[in-house]
């Protein structure tokens, strides 16, 4: 049997990075799903596939959504938070998150306004690829 190479959890890495980065700049909940009791502001991260681009690097497509239900400032604050999240993810390139090595964050789509169709809550969404070392 050959060497066993296992990819780290991309969701755990992304949620950890965003929680830590936002905690000192713009504190709010970061989760992999919409919380049952919605806070007024929160961020969700979901995995939308990906690929093994070589034997040592996994490229995981992530969808990040930023929500803010403030009737006056929600849209502009959600956009600002989405832009901050992009910067936080970009800054992880070449770092370690726990025992996971982040090779880089590659943006696929900039934040786009996408209000929640059920509630009308302002929401911005962006996508990108988190490239992680497989070990």
Locate predicted features.
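Short, charged interaction patches at domain edges and termini
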Residues: 1-13, 48-57, 100-135
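Residue-level marker of positions within ordered structural domains that often coincide
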Residues: 69, 90, 133
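Small/polar-rich, solvent-exposed N-terminal microdomains that initiate assembly or binding
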Residues: 1-54, 92-98
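Mid-chain, well-packed structural core segment of small domains
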Residues: 72-94
């Amino acid at each position: 049997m050959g060497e066993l190479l296992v990819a780290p959890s991309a969701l755990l890495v992304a949620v950890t990075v965003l929680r830590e980065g936002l905690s000192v700049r713009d504190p709010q909940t970061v989760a992999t799903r919409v919380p049952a009791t919605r806070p007024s502001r929160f961020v969700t991260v979901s995995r939308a596939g990906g690929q093994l681009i070589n034997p040592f690097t996994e490229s995981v497509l992530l969808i990040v959504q930023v929500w803010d239900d403030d009737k006056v400032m929600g849209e502009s604050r959600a956009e600002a938070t989405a832009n901050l999240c992009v910067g936080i993810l970009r800054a992880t390139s070449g770092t370690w998150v726990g025992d996971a090595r982040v090779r880089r964050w590659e943006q696929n789509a900039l934040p786009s306004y996408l209000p929640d169709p059920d509630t009308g809550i302002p929401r911005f969404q962006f996508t990108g690829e988190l490239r992680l070392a497989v070990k």
